[in-house]
């Protein structure tokens, strides 16, 4: 039997033993971590995941390196999509990969000691270097894709927050309300424009009340975006009524040379609602 086949057979035979040792030496103080051994079911799930990790890892001895890394990468990426791994701080996952590396290296040293005569000069170091390389590859791949998943989740949450912070509320068959509150930055202004136009077109809104009384700060950019929205609404046949315009908003609008002549303006939202009843 060739050396690589012996290594594959040795590590395949010790999968259960290594997984058991990994679990037995685990110390996790964070109760919310994936690695907190709450009960027998959780423990067995983790152990099976570790067995699976070793089974995939062991193919490094019998597959061409390029093919092995491509197939192994697919498994690691699949692992990063596991919700429990996503919910666990990445430093904990890295810590366990490093513990696995130390454990795996220990078993490699054991094999090398028992089969010293099977190694050609420099061959032991070659396999030891490959083990380190594969574990480094594992950690890098996991961190890279975990970060990508985290960004996707963050973007989804941000979009949800943006949508909730600028809702188009239906008041009647043809009238709706857009209450704007808080700070408006460039990203939010762009979302408000796109979301409002889509919502009005979809609901066949003919008249939109835009209330600005909750907007904290109004600078030149914000004022420009608000009136850009009004112009865009006009192009799709939606008339706009503004309410809650504070003096600083009016001043900024005048400085920008914005034309109010085609816009209905009311002092507050109550007046705007009464106007359309």
From Swiss-Prot:
Q: Domain STAS spans what residues?
A: 165-276
> Null mutant: what phenotype?
Cells lacking this gene have an increased sigma-B activity in response to salt and ethanol stress and also increased sigma-B activity in response to the energy stress associated with entry into stationary phase. These results indicate that this protein is a negative regulator of sigma-B activity.
- What Pfam family is a match, any one? STAS
InterPro entries registered for this protein in UniProt: Bact_StressResp_Reg, STAS_dom, STAS_dom_sf
PTM note? Phosphorylated by RsbT.
This chain belongs to the protein called: RsbT co-antagonist protein RsbRB
Q: How does it assemble?
A: Interacts with RsbRA and RsbS in the stressosome. The stressosome probably also contains RsbRC and RsbRD.
What does the UniProt keyword field contain? Answer: Phosphoprotein
List-wise, which residues carry Phosphothreonine? Answer: 186
Per the record, the gene is rsbRB
Has UniProt tagged this entry with the keyword S-adenosyl-L-methionine? no
Report the function annotation for this chain.
One of 4 functionally non-identical RsbR paralogs, it functions in the environmental signaling branch of the general stress response. Negative regulator of sigma-B activity. Non-phosphorylated RsbS binds to RsbT, preventing its association with RsbU. Requires any one of RsbRA, RsbRB, RsbRC or RsbRD to sequester RsbT. When RsbS and the RsbR paralog(s) are phosphorylated, they release RsbT, which can then bind and activate RsbU.
């Amino acid at each position: 039997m060739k050396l690589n086949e012996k290594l594959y057979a040795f590590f395949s035979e010790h999968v259960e033993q290594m997984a058991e040792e990994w679990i037995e030496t685990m110390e996790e103080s964070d109760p919310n971590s994936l690695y907190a051994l709450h009960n027998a079911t959780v423990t067995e799930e983790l152990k099976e995941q570790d067995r699976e990790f070793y089974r995939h890892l062991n193919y490094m001895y019998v597959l061409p390196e390029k093919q092995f890394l491509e197939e192994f990468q697919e498994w690691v990426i699949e692992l990063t999509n596991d919700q429990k791994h996503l919910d666990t701080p990445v430093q904990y996952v890295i810590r366990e990969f490093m513990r696995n590396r130390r454990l795996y290296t220990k078993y490699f040293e054991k094999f090398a000691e028992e089969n010293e005569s099977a190694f050609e000069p420099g061959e032991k170091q070659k396999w030891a270097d490959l083990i380190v390389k594969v574990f480094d590859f594992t950690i890098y791949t996991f961190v890279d894709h975990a970060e990508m998943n985290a960004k996707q989740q963050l973007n989804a949450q941000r979009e949800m927050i943006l949508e909730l912070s600028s809702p188009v509320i239906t008041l009647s068959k043809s009238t709706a309300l857009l209450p704007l509150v808080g700070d408006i930055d460039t990203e939010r202004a762009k979302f408000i424009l796109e979301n409002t136009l889509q919502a009005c077109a979809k609901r066949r809104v003919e008249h939109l009340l835009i209330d600005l009384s909750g907007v904290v700060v109004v600078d030149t950019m914000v004022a420009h975006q608000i009136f850009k929205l009004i112009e865009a609404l006009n192009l799709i046949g939606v008339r706009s009524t503004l309410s809650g315009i504070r003096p600083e908003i009016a001043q900024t609008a005048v400085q920008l040379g914005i034309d109010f002549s085609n816009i209905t303006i009311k002092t507050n939202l109550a007046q705007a609602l009464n106007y359309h009843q």
